[in-house]
Each structure stands twice: as C-alpha cells, then as structure tokens.
A protein has these predicted regions:
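C-terminal output/effector regions of signal-responsive regulators
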Residues: 135-166
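Short hydrophobic/Thr-rich beta-strand motif most characteristic of the beta2 strand and flanking loop
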Residues: 30-38
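Conserved phosphotransfer microenvironments
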Residues: 18, 39-43, 52-72, 88
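Conserved acidic segment of CheY-like receiver
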Residues: 4-16, 21-25, 35, 54
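A short, hydrophobic beta-strand element within the central beta-sheet of small alpha/beta folds
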Residues: 54, 77-87
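C-terminal output helix
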Residues: 90, 108-117
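Receiver (REC) domain switch/output surface
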Residues: 24, 113-125
C-alpha cells in the first residue's frame, strides 16, 4: 500500500487523461499530486519537484517520445509507471531496460491507478534491493580477489604458507 504522503508527479500532455490519473490518486487519498503538461526541460523540472513516484501517460507515443521517457527513467532513479495505449515487444523490452517499474498498456482507468501505483513502488523497491545486493556481492568478490592476489605475492616473496600469508 502506497504511503499517502508521497509526492506523485503526473506527466501528461493530454488534460483529460491527466485528470483520470489525478482523480484516481486523489480518490486513493493521495493529495500531493503535481501535473506537468509538457516535456520541455523535463529533467530539470523533475529534479525541482523531487517526486517520490512518477506516472507518465503517453497515450500513443512516438518512438522518440518513448525514448525520452526511458531516458528520464534511467536518470531519476525513482519508481516510474508508464501508461501507453499500444505497444510492441521492443518497446516493452526498452521500458524494462530503462528501469520503468510498471509499463501499462491500454490500462488507464481511474479505479486501477492506486493498485498500479502500489505495484510500481513495490517493484521499484524490490529491484533497487536486488541492485544493491548485486553491487555488494561484486564488491565482496573484488575484495576477495585482492586478498588472494596479496596472499600470492606474500607467499612467493617470503616463502610462507597460505595460512601465514592470510
């Protein structure tokens, strides 16, 4: 369940569709909703607003518009749900690669917004946790490699056992 104190950014150039998202959020008790109706200077504006979650509605986006939104998702490191009316497998794959937490095709309904928001935040948190765990494992592996290399140097230069070198 999403925290009702979250700041939600709705990016939608279509006022009717943006209203559907906003009403769904407000009906769910989320009151800190900010709407952007243009993508001009989008990253700067996102960093100024500093939202907890971003909902992007693109209806029937061009490939360029989708790529711009994927770039936003890669850059901001926040839960992002993207609503589109139609898609193909390459766009879905690009969305996943960009870190979009939820990619909703033909699913813009006021009644579904809250559950989609909850799923978006949960999926982002799970992915973020896995990313941190992966980085920790990589760091530990690098440390072990360094220790093994140092042990090898000590064993060779001083003629000592592995246990003594450790």
């Amino acid at each position: 369940m999403a925290d009702t104190s979250l700041t939600i950014l709705v990016i939608d150039e279509n006022p009717t569709r943006a209203t559907i998202l906003e009403e769904g959020l407000r009906d769910a008790g989320l009151v800190d909703v900010v709407r952007l109706d243009t993508t001009h200077e989008l990253l700067r504006r996102i960093f100024e607003i500093d939202p907890d979650v971003i909902l992007i509605d693109l209806a029937s986006p061009s490939r360029d518009a989708l790529e711009q939104m994927f770039q936003v998702s890669r850059t901001v490191k926040r839960p992002v749900a993207m609503f589109v009316d139609q898609s193909d497998s390459s766009m879905i794959e690009a969305a996943v690669d960009a870190g979009v937490s939820a990619y909703i095709v033909d699913g813009l309904k006021k009644e579904r917004v809250k559950s989609i928001l909850d799923m978006t935040v949960s999926r982002f948190n799970a992915f973020d946790r896995l990313t941190r765990e992966l980085q920790q494992a990589r760091d530990e592996l690098a440390d072990r490699k360094l220790i093994e290399r140092a042990k090898g140097i000590l064993m060779k230069s001083r003629g000592i056992s592995e246990e003594e070198a450790y």
